[in-house]
Amino acid sequence: MAVPKFKPSKSRSRTRRSINMRKKIPQFQECSNCGNLVVRHRICLKCGYYRNNQYLEISL
């Protein structure tokens, strides 16, 4: 059975675990069609466009 040769330091352990402590904040960008703020890689709910292609028919 494998056994660690040295005790891992607190800073090494905490650095490894720190990735899980970061806040998950959604990234926003401007819609290329209407200029509305949209979460990245999602269809704009105001105009229905994503990457200059219309995917939703929005009735006003």
Swiss-Prot record:
Q: Which GO terms describe its cellular component?
A: large ribosomal subunit
**The protein's name:** Large ribosomal subunit protein bL32
The yes or no answer to whether the keyword Ribonucleoprotein is present is yes
What is the similarity comment for this entry? Answer: Belongs to the bacterial ribosomal protein bL32 family.
* InterPro entries, per the entry: Ribosomal_bL32, Ribosomal_bL32_bact, Ribosomal_zn-bd
Q: Name one Pfam family in it.
A: Ribosomal_L32p
Q: State the superkingdom.
A: Bacteria
- GO BP terms, alphabetized: translation
A single GO molecular-function term is: structural constituent of ribosome
PANTHER family in alphabetical order: 50S RIBOSOMAL PROTEIN L32, LARGE RIBOSOMAL SUBUNIT PROTEIN BL32
| Keywords, sorted A to Z | Ribonucleoprotein, Ribosomal protein
